[in-house]
């Protein structure tokens, strides 16, 4: 078995042993840069993240899996490609037998997830948003690879160009930080864009909302008209937010909030408006 200077499996050799190339049509881009792979677990240990049971989504040929096994007590790897799932079982036979590695073959958006303590994953770009927002409500630390543009929008502050629905939604569940940008050369095959590693740490918001589901629907609605004032955004998007009486919300809300645009409001501002909308806007049951 070919190993690196640190004693871990060589990523390129893992790809060769898997006997299958990445399918870019399925957004598969294998992380093969040893230096990046070695740093990823360090971002978890530096933050004192509990690594007793790590969930990895999109394990592919197993380069990150190998690094995680060197750090974590247990790893559950979710892989939807049956060929790569079979390769992982063969490559890590000893770890599977020792109950340190569990391979779950299936779609991460559909399978039952274990009771993990953290998720560390190089996500397929096409499903990264859906996977992230399946994981964030679990209130566990996450280290996830995204396209850089998506990552920067996740971590954006209010009133910045990148700030939007994604920023508010992610920040509702966690403190979000871009810890490293990763060039295309770190992957095989190389993607056309730069990637970024995001670390999220669960947080309790400093505001309350009537329900997470209603809050998310309200955000989705008003950010479809982010260039309009909130007055117009609330009125024009009742078909999305489910409000039966959006005019009642506009009349009851603070004028300063109603005259602002979505990109200028803080998460707490949105929570205030969502709570008011829930109370007076006659939302659908």
Curated annotation (Swiss-Prot):
Signal sequence segment: none
Gene that encodes it: rsmA
Annotated InterPro entries: KsgA/Erm, rRNA_Ade_diMease-like_C, rRNA_Ade_Mease_Trfase_CS, rRNA_Ade_methylase_Trfase_N, rRNA_adenine_dimethylase, SAM-dependent_MTases_sf
Subcellular location: Cytoplasm
Root EC class: transferase
One annotated GO molecular function: RNA binding
Entry protein name: Probable ribosomal RNA small subunit methyltransferase A
Higher taxonomy: Archaea, Methanobacteriati, Methanobacteriota, Stenosarchaea group, Halobacteria
Keywords: Cytoplasm, Methyltransferase, RNA-binding, rRNA processing, S-adenosyl-L-methionine, Transferase
Organism expressing this protein natively: Haloarcula marismortui (strain ATCC 43049 / DSM 3752 / JCM 8966 / VKM B-1809)
